[in-house]
């Protein structure tokens, strides 16, 4: 009786521990697709077209601008800041985008892991301490500028992913 159970378990042993790794190309493809989806969601919000991502708006300097070269760590840091900003906006338009940013950060962590990189916990979020004051003064402007700059940053990230960014 015990032998049959043991034999059955030993027969299944290789299948129980067989884990097929997800090809890194699939993760990179999913990352690019999610970036394109987020950009499309931003485009669907009509009022984001009114501000250039390069335009400077007084009081909103804490919102990241465009970067010429981004590493995976810098991408994660930038997305963490945008996610923190979007979470604090009361608009319903940004809830799904904020959730998508969380998923995008998870995919970036997988890409980093595949390159044996360790992404540190996102820091610099302490610069957002004054976010509440800014939101009270200019809620609409903050949303428009944040989404516009996020869109530009995502397009930069899409381009950088084709170049296989470093850690």
Curated annotation (Swiss-Prot):
Annotated GO biological process: activation of protein kinase C activity; adipose tissue development; adult feeding behavior; angiogenesis; aorta development; bile acid metabolic process; bone growth; cell surface receptor signaling pathway via JAK-STAT
Compartments reported by the entry: Secreted
Signal peptide extent: 1-21
Superkingdom, natural source: Eukaryota
Alphabetically ordered keywords of this record: Disulfide bond, Obesity, Secreted, Signal
Single GO term (MF): hormone activity
Gene3D superfamilies: 1.20.1250.10
GO cellular component: cytoplasm; extracellular space
SS bond list: 117-167
Similarity remark: Belongs to the leptin family.
Functional summary from the UniProt entry: Key player in the regulation of energy balance and body weight control. Once released into the circulation, has central and peripheral effects by binding LEPR, found in many tissues, which results in the activation of several major signaling pathways. In the hypothalamus, acts as an appetite-regulating factor that induces a decrease in food intake and an increase in energy consumption by inducing anorexinogenic factors and suppressing orexigenic neuropeptides, also regulates bone mass and secretion of hypothalamo-pituitary-adrenal hormones.
Protein name: Leptin
Naturally occurring in which organism (per UniProt): Macaca mulatta
Lineage: Eukaryota, Metazoa, Chordata, Craniata, Vertebrata
């Amino acid at each position: 009786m015990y032998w049959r159970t043991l034999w059955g378990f030993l027969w299944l042993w290789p299948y129980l521990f067989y884990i097929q790794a997800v090809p890194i190309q699939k993760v990179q493809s999913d990352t690019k697709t999610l970036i394109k989806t987020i950009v499309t969601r931003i485009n669907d919000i009509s009022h984001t077209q009114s501000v250039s991502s390069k335009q400077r708006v007084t009081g909103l300097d804490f919102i990241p601008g465009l970067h010429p070269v981004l590493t995976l760590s810098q991408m994660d840091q930038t997305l963490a800041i945008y996610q923190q900003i979007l979470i604090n906006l009361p608009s319903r338009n940004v809830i799904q985008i904020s959730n998508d940013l969380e998923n995008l950060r998870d995919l970036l962590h997988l890409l980093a892991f595949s390159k044996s990189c360790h992404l540190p916990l996102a820091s610099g979020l302490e610069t957002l301490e004054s976010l509440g004051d800014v939101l009270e003064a200019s809620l609409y402007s903050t949303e428009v500028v944040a989404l516009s700059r996020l869109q530009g940053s995502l397009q930069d990230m899409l381009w950088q992913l084709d170049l296989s960014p470093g850690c």
